[in-house]
């Protein structure tokens, strides 16, 4: 394969590229969600609004999972990080549809909230979520994730206008970047928040804890860390590779306020992500690797795998069942 750079692109953060293009991702069957009043938790709205909120959030997550499969299948001979993308789907859906102040949609650009996907190998989950948030266009997706015309990549290139605040690929780097953003935002007296998504395997990296120490020491309350704890990494179960004990307790020790939630309970995620206190927050989201796909759930081989025609058909059946259950 060959690395391609468009004329305006830097070599920094560019992934290995091959030829190819992506067809359109059809999301017309799922309604566009409306932004929810950020001053209210799900428990503070009436039952009808709460049910509608849950319905919207679950459909957003299904849209993301459908987007993951569609994009990966169009490059069926190229492996993608399907498992981690599906485990983080609910998190990015809730963030971008209901929690974050997105610059192009909700506020002045400088006042936007920032999302750092430190586990950048799962960027496939971000594309459909950013499309729904109007940060990227259908044309961007149509140009593909490989080749000289691509503006989206398997490992993202920094492009804040499209929602990519940092180039990705090397694990352990995102939280340090989030720390710098949080400090800069505070010094500018802005109310913006910084959300940083980590993987639990990524938390083996020492740089994560250096950054956590800095954030805790400076009490950067505008920084919220979300750990996608699917308990698996490239080589197997996290506990077998390097058992580091409770991630929540570690963040507590660095001065964070930590909370543990079901990472596929969209209302629990919504409430946890909306809260902001006088301390930085760490949300440990207990998830299932490959969530929503019968062949990929808790299957470490789908850490990085191809979506064949047969798997694609099975995925569509799985998502159809989930869609029907959501509508009941």
Show the residue positions of the predicted features:
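Glycine-rich beta-alpha junction loops
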Residues: 121-122, 230-231, 265, 287-290
């Amino acid at each position: 394969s060959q690395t391609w750079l468009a004329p305006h692109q830097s070599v920094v953060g560019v992934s290995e590229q091959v030829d190819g293009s992506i067809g359109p991702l059809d999301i017309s069957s799922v309604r566009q969600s409306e932004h929810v009043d950020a001053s209210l938790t799900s428990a503070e709205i009436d039952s009808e609004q709460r049910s509608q909120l849950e319905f919207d959030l679950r459909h957003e997550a299904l849209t993301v999972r459908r987007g993951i499969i569609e994009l990966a299948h169009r490059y069926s001979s190229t492996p993608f990080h399907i498992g981690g993308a599906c485990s983080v789907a609910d998190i990015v859906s809730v963030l971008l549809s209901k929690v974050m102040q997105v610059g192009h949609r909700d506020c002045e650009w400088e006042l936007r909230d920032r999302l750092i996907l430190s586990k950048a190998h799962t960027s496939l989950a971000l594309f459909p979520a950013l499309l729904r948030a109007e940060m990227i266009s259908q044309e961007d997706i149509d140009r593909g994730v490989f080749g000289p015309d691509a503006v989206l990549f398997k490992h993202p290139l920094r492009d804040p206008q499209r929602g990519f605040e940092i180039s990705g690929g090397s694990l352990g780097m995102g939280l340090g970047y989030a720390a710098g953003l949080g400090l800069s935002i505070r010094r500018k007296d802005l109310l913006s928040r910084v959300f940083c998504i980590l993987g639990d395997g990524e938390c083996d990296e020492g740089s994560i804890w250096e950054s956590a120490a800095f954030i805790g020491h400076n009490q950067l309350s505008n920084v919220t860390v979300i750990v996608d704890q699917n308990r698996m990494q490239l080589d197997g179960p996290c506990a077998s590779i390097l058992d580091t004990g409770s991630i929540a307790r570690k963040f507590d020790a660095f001065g964070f306020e930590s909370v543990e939630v079901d990472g596929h309970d969209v209302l629990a995620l919504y409430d946890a992500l909306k809260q902001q206190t006088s301390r930085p927050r760490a949300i440990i989201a207990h998830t299932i690797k490959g969530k929503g796909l019968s062949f990929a759930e808790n299957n470490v081989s789908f850490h990085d795998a191809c979506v064949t025609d047969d798997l694609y058909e099975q995925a569509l059946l799985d998502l159809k069942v989930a869609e029907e259950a959501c509508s009941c």
